[in-house]
Swiss-Prot record:
InterPro entries: DUF1425, YcfL-like_sf. It comes from the Bacteria. This is Uncharacterized protein YcfL. It comes from Escherichia coli (strain K12). GO terms for biological process: DNA damage response.
Length: 125
């Protein structure tokens, strides 16, 4: 009887620990552009971010395209990574841009860190 109760309590605790994880979008290390599927449904496409390094600070740009007949507001954030692939903190604040109908907009971001070697752009509605 005691073994059965102990096993049941262990199972419940294991399930609760598994439920505690935060939902995340699975991302490959080489994936520099992450778009939520709702953007594609809204007629938005994007180019991978282009990373430019200079003596002053790294910067990145990416062009977004709106293929629809109405403007679409897109939220975005650039994530910066060091030479070892570690995310650099503090994170940039999320920003927004409204892309006019049948138009393109170029997003620009600058790393506030001298050691940034990689960038990832996250886009969502």
């Amino acid at each position: 009887m005691r073994k059965g109760c102990f096993g049941l309590v262990s199972l419940v605790l294991l399930l609760l620990v598994g439920c505690r994880s935060h939902p995340e979008i699975p991302v490959n290390d080489e994936q520099s552009l992450v778009m939520e599927s709702s953007l594609l449904a809204a007629g938005i496409s994007a180019e991978k971010p282009f990373l430019s390094t200079s003596d002053i600070q790294p910067s990145a740009s990416s062009t977004l395209y709106n293929e629809r007949q109405e403007p679409v507001t897109v939220h975005y954030r650039f994530y910066w990574y060091d030479a070892r692939g570690l995310e650099m903190h503090p994170l940039e604040r999320p920003r927004s841009v409204t892309i006019p109908a049948h138009s393109a907009v170029t997003l620009y971001g600058s790393a506030n860190f001298l050691g940034a070697h990689k960038v990832r752009l996250y886009l969502y509605l």
